[in-house]
Amino acid sequence: MSADRAILHSDMNAFYASVEMMLDPKLRGKAVAVCGSTENRHGIVLAKSELAKRAGVKTGMVNWEAKQRCKDLILVPPQYDQYLKYSKLAHEIYYRYTDLVEPFGMDECWLDVTGCEIYGKPLEIAEEIRQSVKEELGLTVSIGVSFNKIFAKLGSDLKKPDAITVITKQNFKENIWPLAASELLYVGSATTKKLASYGIKTIGDLAATEPSTLKYMFGINGLKLWRYANGTDESRVMQKDFVSPVKSIGHGITCTADLDNEEEVLHVLLELSQDVGHRLRVHGLAATGVQIFVRNKSLYSTQYQYKLPFKTQLPSEIAAAGFQLFKEHYIWTEKVRAVTIRAIDLIPQTTEEQLSLMVDYERRDRRVRLEDAIEDLRRRFGKKSLTYAGLLGNLKMPDDGRDSVKMPGLMYQ
């Protein structure tokens, strides 16, 4: 791999569950699931141990179904502060070799070790990292070693747990092309279904498809898919301090229990929009569009978007637009498992806008002053110092005190 880039992708195996078992020796060697609500039988499995996985427990299952699959399953509540702590400790190990470390969630990272021969060959560096994480943190990782980010990520998925997989220009067709197209990063259920309708079922099928056909199907993203499948992705691993240009701002969660009705969905959207509105203000941006992403209890995902008649930073307006989208499009055949709301088509807040006869600007000005005051109070006294009365009580959301890790936005669903 000396003539190529050397990219590693490190994935901490069954991360939440592994941290719990490392912290509590009584859990080791047992089937464990981390759940948003351990008391509620309709709580959701957020992560599971390897033994639980072998018994058929899946992330996103409700508690009672997981217990049916695995009678000896032990349910534990999440400790987000501990997960963040061990995520940061793993990152410190990665930084011993390179400052080109790009997080992909709390438990995954890309590392560019091109030109780092002083530490050994890429495979040797991967082996050192694997051993260091195990010895110093008591956790295991699977690492993919390849010449681009996409194949490195696939490599880390191929062997689990505690393993290393090398994908080269010489062997990727043999190892990668037979895999289902859905295994490719950023390809979700809707894209997989559309590809299948054209007879494209494997990554190899995707690689052999004419780029013009994929562009017709998915626009510019279709060409990216073709490059990913053919191993020609050249996207860089970003330096640890790199901040990408803000193209959209969103917030989403997997609920601790399934949402049963529109009122519960509205409350979740309003709570998520508080964070979105705050971050828009921090960046000095305003949204001219809103997008929502909804996953049902069968883990089928859909997304919808709407062009706003005005620019906004207001959480209430962002949530209202998202809720309108939900009411117009979501069919209640199943309960809702996860929700994301995103501010899109961003412009500088200082951008002049054309006035519309359809907007009550006097009412909007009052709302702006109110939410400015709320933002100021939260900045001075903390996020929980003031909230809407409708957001009190059980929102079926994870503990608000958790730390979150930024991730690249979903490209495909």
Residue ranges and their predicted role:
Residues C109-G115, Q303-Y306, E353-V359:
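Short, hydrophobic beta-strand segments
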Residues H9, E183, T191-K335:
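DNA-contacting surface of Y-family translesion DNA polymerases
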